[in-house]
Amino acid sequence: KMGKKFFCCDAVLDTASRQIEIHSGWAKEMQPIAWKTADRRTYVHWAEKKYDIVVFGMPTNFHYGDGMGTNTIQMMQALSAQVIRHKRILSDHCVFIVSSICDGWFHEERWPYLRELYELFQHDSMNILPDMNRYGEYFATKEEYIRKYRFANAFHPFHGFSMMSCGHLAEEHTSAIYIVGAREPGIARGMGLKTRATFEEALEDAKRKFTGPAPNILALPRTFTTTAVHLCMKDPGENSHYRDGAPAHPCGG
């Protein structure tokens, strides 16, 4: 405990990152007020049915920077972020179909450790991303990666383990993820992703193997281009504690 009160300003932003509400004061009293508006913006009670297939695109530059949508460790984090945001409206056999150039550019100036992490995941009995955990301290203390973090504007090497920790959720909570249009499809398959040349091919394969012939399909064309919302069922009673992981969640579950 610091023993002092801190004066803070807290702005609530909309989907276009514009300020829609500003509060000032002691953080302990002021921030819960700001969270009420932020929750109304973020948790959108919209869906009247669960979706079997979700379709969206993955730009090259978003979230953590340029290259986010071209190397598969960062891509897995982004895919898992979609699970976190929308799991309340996903069916239990949901499939993602995602466009990405996935060309193997790791942007090593920004993430100098990612290629080594990816290559290590392909060997040494690494079956799922959590198996990589035992190498966390090794990467986090590797001198050259630390030097690039300190002096060359790179991310800290342990950041890659944060990405993989989140990235495992995509495998856990979807039946399959298809990457469409990959220029280096092998690196996508190396992370457990399926690859197809077109959306039509991916959709037909998903219907045949996972969803049946008449899936509920949700297209999200603005994914990763605006500030995300968390889609919820229109009826708050359908947003379960199990899906939210919190008993008093603003989505109503």
Where are these regions (language model features)?
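Conserved, well-structured core segments that form the ligand-binding/active-site neighborhood
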Residues: 1-52, 57-60, 77-90
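Structural signal for hydrophobic packing residues in well-ordered secondary-structure cores
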Residues: 2-3, 58, 62, 90, ...
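Short coil/turn connectors at secondary-structure junctions
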Residues: 3-6, 49-52, 91-95, 123, ...
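Short, glycine-/Ser/Thr-/acidic-enriched flexible segments
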Residues: 14, 59-62, 102-105, 184-185, ...
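Short glycine/threonine-rich loop-to-helix capping motif typified by GTGT followed
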Residues: 21-22, 64-73, 106-119, 192, ...
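Structural motif
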Residues: 52-57, 97, 218-219
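C-terminal catalytic subdomain
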Residues: 73-178
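Extended hydrophobic packing segments that form well-structured cores
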Residues: 165-245, 250-251
